[in-house]
Amino acid sequence: MPKTNSSAASTNANPSSLQQHTPMMQQYLKIKAEHPDILLFYRMGDFYELFFDDAKKAAELLDISLTARGKSGGNAIPMAGVPYHAVENYLARLVKMGQSVAIVEQVGDPATSKGPVERKVQRIVTPGTVSDEALLNDKQDSILAAVFCPTQKANQELIFGYATLDVTSGRFTLCELSGEEALAAELQRTNPVELLYPDDFAYSHLINQRKGLRRRPQWEFDLQTATNQLTSQFGTNELSGFGVQNHQVGICAAGCVMQYIKDTQRSALPHIDRIVLESHNDTVVMDAATRRNLELTFNLSGGIENTLASILDKTSTPMGSRLLQRWIHRPLTDVTVLKKRQRNIQGLMESPYTQLQSALKKIGDMQRVLARLALRSARPRDFARLRQAFALLPDIQHYLEHEISHTSESAQPSDLLHLAEKISQYPDFADLLERAVIEAPPVLIRDGGVIKEGYNEELDRLRELSKGATDYLEELELREKERTGIASLKVGYNRVHGYFIEVSRSQSDLVPVEYVRRQTLKNNERYIIPELKEHEDNVLSSQSRSLALEKRLYDELFDLLLPQLTQLMQSADALAELDVLTNLAERAESLDYHRPELCPQSGIHFSQGRHPVVEQVSDAPFIANPINVNPDRRMLVITGPNMGGKSTYMRQTALIVLMAYIGSYIPAQDAQIGPIDRIFTRIGASDDLASGRSTFMVEMTETANILNNATANSLVLMDEIGRGTSTYDGLSLAWACAEYLATKLQSFTLFATHYFELTGLADALPELANVHLDAVEHGESIRFMHAVQDGAANKSYGLQVAQLAGVPKLVVQAAKRKLHELETGDISKQGRQETSPVNTVYATEKVETQLDLLSQTSEAEDLLHSIQPDDLTPKQALDYLYQLKKLVR
């Protein structure tokens, strides 16, 4: 089974022998026994301490000191700790590593406690349940997921139940997936930060590389238990109102999620008020390999640079950024929805949308603020953000209702007006927060200073008592100096001893009899008098009552806002959607994207197609290329040199199609794109050492998935099939796969290969065409043209690419001789050279490496001699100019 990434449950102490420990350690061990699988942060004064195995693990993960405290069984008890004021930083690091932490706070009063101060677990922080701003990545969803697979009967289809919850937005979904590939794809799409699975889960190989794994008892996946959990949360008698009642395997997974979130949050969850059945019938399906190879939101190294999302995402709000990523990972097949998005984008492009972006930037992450409101964990600055958002909503609504509908002839007003209605306005809430919360509140309510003056008369009165303390103390000090004649007399205060009258020791014999000594210092004596004691009681009482009242008023803000939580969440969702649409309008205008036509007829056609990522990160001008596949031309066999652009051309086609199916404009012109149900890629491969699979096995597994699942409406990218085995095996497999895709499946396929024998398929199969990316040789160098042309390439230029890569010239020259032998048939059928073993390709080293320096010309000269100026387009001429600049550097 997979590791759970949790703290070891064992410690060096046996809870059954608690009596050998101090009372404090007994208390710790009892609490730890209730949370054996997670780290326990145990509050002691100004630190959170960890003991035993927790201390060892925390010291390693957080790079903090490991010390010792007391003994257990004759051995020192390992201990580590972090200061309470910096705990959020440490929690953020642990959550990022997939760890969970139980926070134990002191809840008793040390002054009245007999024995250790009472402590309780106040919150449990896990990767999938955190809502604190400091612990979250604001541009990525924080998904808690559960997977369940019932015991399979003979010949029964393999079904997985999969449920996800984003506690920071309340979005709760379930689905049922057929087979391992479907589950792998869904895990890749949703990328949960925490994954729950039953302790008898039989498919550990699908999840054991993930962080944040949590093994759960089987009873949490019981159907009746799960149903009860869900109906209890939603306040319903059954689940039929959500349309999920027939998806029992998915319900089992969702029930586990709900049980876990209740166990960890220990509070009401009013924003989780529904569950949505996710169907893949209305989406363009992509498997895990495709999502990875296309580098949608993460590149092949796991970073976020040079991905499709990094180019498309210039959103104004974090919630808009997260929604855009969900759109990218879930392209739709519903053309009605997609055309509506296109109309909205066009309407925004024809309006002064920068005003809208400025307003949205000030809105911030309203979704997550509202989630903290629902969990009653919102902080003072969250209320300040809500106040600012409420103040901006009227301007945004006015913009949607007037600026766009009056200036745009393209967008149907009802499209964006519907968003305006969902955004709504909350003038009462705006007024409430304006009156209640100060302009720049502190981070926490703990020490008060949040509620604005004038909001509550009693609070103002109590605060005045505290403020008046300074005037009174100054007056008392002057009065006592005059009365006693002691010039050094001062009135002061500290938190330990309270208020006091301080007199230098040399004048202490002058103090009146009613002065009662409170503290003796080296050079001074401190006293208290009845009048000052009475003032102290009044002030401290007023401060205590003021803070208690302020906290009560703060809690009342939750009570006043929460009844409208559902509508507020709908407003936040609408703002996120508006942000994405505005962002796509800006991207289309800034990056010269065009509106594609989504057609009912099969096929993919566009001109001047560009790779959305490569064109932005490349220094050289990007060479745009067309594509045309249709029912009469379903497969393109693509040949050409390595580095010639074959993979870029294939990927750009898939990305352009995907962008069209999220409703975006695309980096291509004259686009007509027909129905697409799936996108498959078989591009690149590496060993899967963890599963014991070779590169070739990975390649064949991905190929098998394509051949078993592709349809006539699928887009398939196949790159270098068969290269991981012998030449004849590889060629045979590539030939058979190409023929099967073209004739049996009839998928729209881009098939890149270096097996030039495959180009002969075009003579036998009318639905197959050859295209190539050309290159031009200049002496010893090569220049890649990157332009797609009809017909097959005449060679692969592998030796020239090897030379560019820095392979020693001696090796390249030897390879050229061997290539000549192979091409002229100087190798026997057995593959042995008809010469002495000593007569190798390096035998003529002395002759061949003797260079004629005088006869050599520069690469720049060779290139200039090869150019025919009258045949060049302006674009090609500019291209040559860039190439010449590189050569003369």
Swiss-Prot record:
- What InterPro entries has UniProt attached to this entry? DNA_mismatch_repair_MutS (IPR005748), DNA_mismatch_repair_MutS-lik_N (IPR007695), DNA_mismatch_repair_MutS/MSH (IPR017261), DNA_mismatch_repair_MutS_C (IPR000432), DNA_mismatch_repair_MutS_clamp (IPR007861), DNA_mismatch_repair_MutS_core (IPR007696), DNA_mismatch_repair_MutS_N (IPR016151), DNA_mismatch_repair_MutS_sf (IPR036187)
Q: Where is the composition biased (Low complexity)?
A: 1-17
Region Disordered: what ranges?
1-20
Q: Where does ATP bind?
A: G640, P641, N642, M643, G644, G645, K646, S647
User: What are the GO MF terms of this UniProt record?
Assistant: ATP binding; ATP-dependent DNA damage sensor activity; damaged DNA binding; mismatched DNA binding
Instruction: Quote a single Gene Ontology cellular component term.
Output: cytosol
- UniProt keyword terms in alphabetical order: ATP-binding, DNA damage, DNA repair, DNA-binding, Nucleotide-binding
Look up the record and give one Gene Ontology term from the biological process aspect.
mismatch repair
Record has DNA-binding as a keyword: yes
Keyword DNA-binding tagged: yes
State the protein's purpose. This protein is involved in the repair of mismatches in DNA. It is possible that it carries out the mismatch recognition step. This protein has a weak ATPase activity.
Q: Which family does it belong to?
A: Belongs to the DNA mismatch repair MutS family.
Name listed for the protein in its UniProt record = DNA mismatch repair protein MutS
Give the classification, highest ranks: Bacteria, Pseudomonadati, Pseudomonadota, Gammaproteobacteria, Alteromonadales
Gene name of the record: mutS
